Amino acid sequence: MFTITRERELLLGHLDAQRRHVFGILEGLSDEQLRRPLLPSGWHCLGMVKHLALADEHYWFRCVVAGESRDYFPPEPDGEWQVGPDESAQDVFDLYRDEIRRSDAIITGTDLDAPPAQPDERWTSWGADFPDLRSVLLHMLTETSIHAGHLDAVRELIDGRQWVVVEQVSDRGLPQSS
């Protein structure tokens, strides 16, 4: 029987797999490599991790789902992508880990059908709708997967390393780790 508990476990399990992907693809890179922009847009790996922490985990779970204030966001344009020289790679990774821990507490303590505590008026202009935690989880799974893929491409440009994701599909159509 498929239950709400099982649904939450599946969604959170897949989100966790993508979060691990982010950490895994960056493992072994030097501080210089983590800060080196390789694409024309100018972002770098540490900036992506900070973006995942602030614009994704913090914003979607702490602000949207739990209703916390949005005044945490850096005031400068694209501030969530900026990593100062005084911020170490470990600081940025720890920030992301802390936001994941806080997000998980919100996810496990909130009903999947619960509406957002703090909807964002910008969603309409984005053509998006997030009526409940379930839709936010699906959005975050997509966002984190996309950004993990961006990091894959940059890592391959840095040193040729690739992150190969292999999943098998069970007879019920649910992905299972191999």
Protein language model regions, located:
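Short, contiguous pre-domain boundary segments
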Residues: 1-7
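Short, contiguous alpha-helical
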Residues: 8-27, 31-79, 120-178
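Acidic/histidine-rich alpha-helical segments that form the ligand environment
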Residues: 80-120, 132-145
